[in-house]
C-alpha cells in the first residue's frame, strides 16, 4: 500500500466525545454561553480533532512549500520566475513577511523546495523535496505526470509526519511560486465547475491585459486536458503545481495524525480541494484562516463548507494569514483550558426564570 493510501485510510471522524466534553466546559466558563463566538466553536473543533477535551497547542509550525510553474512563461504573472528562488532565500534569511509573523506568534518556519527552477544552496532550514525544475507549461502539456502528482502529495505527507514527530502540534500551510495563482485558478475551476473568469484574479498584480491572458491560458488548458473533477491526482497532474500537491499532502498527513491544520489563502485553498477530492474525511480537520482578495477563494469555501476566521484584505500567501489563524487557535484553546468555571470562581450563574 502506498503512503498516500495508508494516510487516507487513517483519517477518521472527529472525536465526538472530546468535542462534547469541550462544549460542556465552554458552557460553564465564567461568561455568557456563546459570548466568545467563533473562539468557542474553534476550541470545540480542535478538541474533536485532537481527541483531547482541553487541548494545549504549544508547538506551532508553518510549512512553506515553494515551486515554479512552466505556465509562468505565458506572461500570466507580474513578476519573473526567478523571484521564487530569491524569496526562498529571503525566507531562509528570516526577512520575509512570513518570518516576521511567525516570530510574532512563536511558530517555526519550515521551508520546502518542491520544485524551484534553480539549484538552491544547502541550508539547515531548507528541506529538499524537489520534483523538478518547475512544472511543465500546462497550456500545451500536462503540468506533471500522474506519478509525480502522487509523489508530490506523498512528499507533503512526509513533511507533516516529520514535523509532528518532532513535536509540532498545530500546522499552518504556506506557499511561494511565481505563477501559482494561475495553477490554483485552474484547479479551482476544474474541481468546482465554476467559469474560469469567476475564479481568476490578479495574483501578484497583473494588469487588465495580463488578467485576460491568464484567463485565456487557463481556459485553453482545461479544454485541452479535461481534468476529472473527482480525481484530485488527475487535476493536480494536468493543471496543478508541485507545491500545491505538497500542501495537499500536508493537510492529509496532519488529519491522519489528528493534528489541526490551518490553511492560508487561495493557493492553500486549491490544495485543500485536491486533498478533499482524495479524502473527503479531511474536511473537518481544516481550519480556514482568512478570506483572500483572490476572487476564486470564495468558491473554495463554498465547495468545502468552510468559514474563514477573518478577512484583512490579504493576498500575499507564504502562510501569513495561516500563522495569524494559528494564534487564534491557540487563544481559543487557552480560553477553554485556563478560564475558571462559575463553580471554581464562585460566580453566580445565569438566573433561570
Swiss-Prot record:
The active site is at 318 (proton acceptor). It holds the Pfam family DBI_PRT. Its EC number is 2.4.2.21. Pathway: Nucleoside biosynthesis; alpha-ribazole biosynthesis; alpha-ribazole from 5,6-dimethylbenzimidazole: step 1/2. The keyword Zinc-finger does not apply. The keyword Transferase applies. It is an enzyme of class 2 (transferase). Keywords: Cobalamin biosynthesis, Glycosyltransferase, Transferase. GO terms for molecular function: nicotinate-nucleotide-dimethylbenzimidazole phosphoribosyltransferase activity. It catalyses: 5,6-dimethylbenzimidazole + nicotinate beta-D-ribonucleotide = alpha-ribazole 5'-phosphate + nicotinate + H(+). GO terms for biological process: cobalamin biosynthetic process. Catalyzes the synthesis of alpha-ribazole-5'-phosphate from nicotinate mononucleotide (NAMN) and 5,6-dimethylbenzimidazole (DMB). Belongs to the CobT family. This is Nicotinate-nucleotide--dimethylbenzimidazole phosphoribosyltransferase. It comes from Roseiflexus sp. (strain RS-1). The lineage of its organism: Bacteria, Bacillati, Chloroflexota, Chloroflexia, Chloroflexales. The gene is cobT.
Amino acid at each position: 500500500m502506498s503512503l498516500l493510501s495508508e494516510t487516507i485510510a487513517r483519517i477518521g471522524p472527529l472525536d465526538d466525545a472530546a468535542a462534547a466534553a469541550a462544549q460542556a466546559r465552554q458552557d460553564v466558563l465564567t461568561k455568557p454561553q456563546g459570548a466568545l463566538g467563533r473562539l468557542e466553536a474553534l476550541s470545540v473543533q480542535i478538541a474533536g480533532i485532537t481527541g483531547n477535551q482541553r487541548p494545549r497547542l504549544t508547538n506551532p509550525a508553518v510549512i512553506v512549500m515553494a515551486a515554479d510553474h512552466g505556465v509562468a512563461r505565458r506572461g500570466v504573472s507580474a513578476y519573473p520566475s526567478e523571484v521564487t528562488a530569491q524569496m526562498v532565500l529571503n525566507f531562509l534569511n528570516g526577512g520575509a513577511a512570513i518570518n516576521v509573523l511567525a516570530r510574532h506568534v512563536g511558530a517555526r518556519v519550515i521551508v520546502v523546495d518542491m520544485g524551484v527552477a534553480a539549484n538552491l544552496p544547502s541550508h539547515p532550514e531548507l528541506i529538499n523535496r524537489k520534483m523538478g525544475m518547475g512544472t511543465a507549461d500546462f497550456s500545451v502539456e500536462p503540468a506533471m505526470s500522474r506519478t509525480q502528482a502522487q509523489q508530490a502529495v506523498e512528499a507533503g505527507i512526509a513533511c507533516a509526519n516529520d514535523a509532528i514527530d518532532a513535536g509540532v502540534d498545530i500546522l499552518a500551510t504556506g506557499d511561494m511560486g511565481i505563477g501559482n495563482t494561475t495553477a490554483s485558478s485552474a484547479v479551482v475551476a476544474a474541481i468546482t465547475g465554476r467559469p474560469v473568469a469567476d475564479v481568476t484574479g490578479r495574483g501578484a498584480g497583473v494588469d487588465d491585459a495580463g488578467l485576460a491572458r491568464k484567463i485565456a491560458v487557463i481556459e485553453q488548458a482545461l479544454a485541452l486536458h479535461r481534468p476529472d473533477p473527482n480525481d484530485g491526482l488527475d487535476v493536480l497532474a494536468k493543471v496543478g503545481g508541485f507545491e500545491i500537491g505538497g500542501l495537499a499532502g500536508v493537510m492529509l498527513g496532519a488529519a491522519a495524525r489528528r493534528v489541526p491544520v490551518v490553511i492560508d489563502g487561495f493557493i492553500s485553498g486549491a490544495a485543500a480541494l485536491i486533498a478533499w477530492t482524495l479524502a473527503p474525511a479531511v474536511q473537518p480537520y481544516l481550519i480556514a484562516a482568512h478570506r483572500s482578495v483572490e476572487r476564486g477563494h470564495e468558491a473554495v469555501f463554498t465547495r468545502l463548507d468552510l468559514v474563514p476566521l477573518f478577512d484583512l484584505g490579504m493576498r500575499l500567501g507564504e502562510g501569513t494569514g495561516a500563522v495569524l489563524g494559528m494564534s487564534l487557535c491557540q487563544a481559543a484553546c487557552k480560553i477553554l483550558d485556563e478560564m475558571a468555571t462559575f463553580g471554581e470562581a464562585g460566580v453566580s450563574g445565569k438566573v433561570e426564570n
